C-alpha cells in the first residue's frame, strides 16, 4: 500500500557498536575500505586497512572511545536518535530514519523500514553542512544505490550541503554566543575535519583554482562550488559576520592521519602558534560536526586540551558543544526540510 508520507533519511558516517577492540576493528575495516575515504588503488587500500590499520589501530584508540562512551552508548548515535525523534514530532508528514554509512543503524535498514511503510518519495540529507566526497558524496551514492535496488520506482531528492544556509549560520552563532566557553576565552578557533589536498583538487574541474590561486576559498565560483575547504571558509565568514567576535579568531583543520599532505592549517600547528603568542584560554567551535562525536569530545576536548595545557603552557582549550539537539536547531532544521520539498 502506498504511503502519502515522505521518507527522510538523515545520513551520517557511523560509529562502532561498542567500545571494544572487535567492534572498533569491524567499524574501521568497513569505513576505511570505502574508496571515497582512502582513494588509493584497490591493492594499496587493502594493504593499509588489513596490514597496517586493522591489526594495530583498534587497540591504540580503544581508550579514546571508552573516554566518551555514555550510558546511552555512542554520543554520535545517541544524539542522532534524539534529534530524529524531536524532528519527527515537528514533521508528522515525514517518516524519518537514521542511516549510517558504516555500522548501525545502516542505510539499508533505513531504506527497508521506509519500504515496509510503502514510502515512494525519499529525501536524503547528509548531516554534514560542508560537502566532501568522502562524507556526503559517499553517503549519497550508497543510499541511492540501495534505494534503486529496494524501491526501484522511488523518487529521490537530495540536500547535498547547507554550509551557508541562514538557518544553520544563525544556529551556530546562537550556540557560540550562549556558551560559557566563548564568553570566557581569549581566542576563538573554528576547527573543521581535515581532508587530503588531492581530494580537494579532484573536485576542481578547472584544475586551476583550488589550492592553486591565492585566496581560492574566499568566494564561491564554478571551480570551487563543491570544494570542502571553500565551504568551511564561507561558513566561518558568515558566522563571524553575525557573531562580531569580541576576541581574535581563525580557522583550522583536525583529525589528520597518514602521510599525505592535508589541507592546512592543522590544529596542532595553530595551538603552537597561539602558545607562542601568549594566549592561554582558547574556545573551539567545530561547525562541520552537527553532533558531538569522537572527533569533538575526545580529540578536541580531551587530547588537544591536554596537549595545550601540559605541553604548550596554556590554561585551557575548551570545546564549544555541537548543535546536537538544541531546540532552536531542531526547529530550524525542520523548517529547512519543509522548504526543501
What do the PLM-derived regions correspond to, one by one?
Residues 2-341:
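Active-site-proximal alpha-helix that buttresses catalytic centers in soluble enzyme cores
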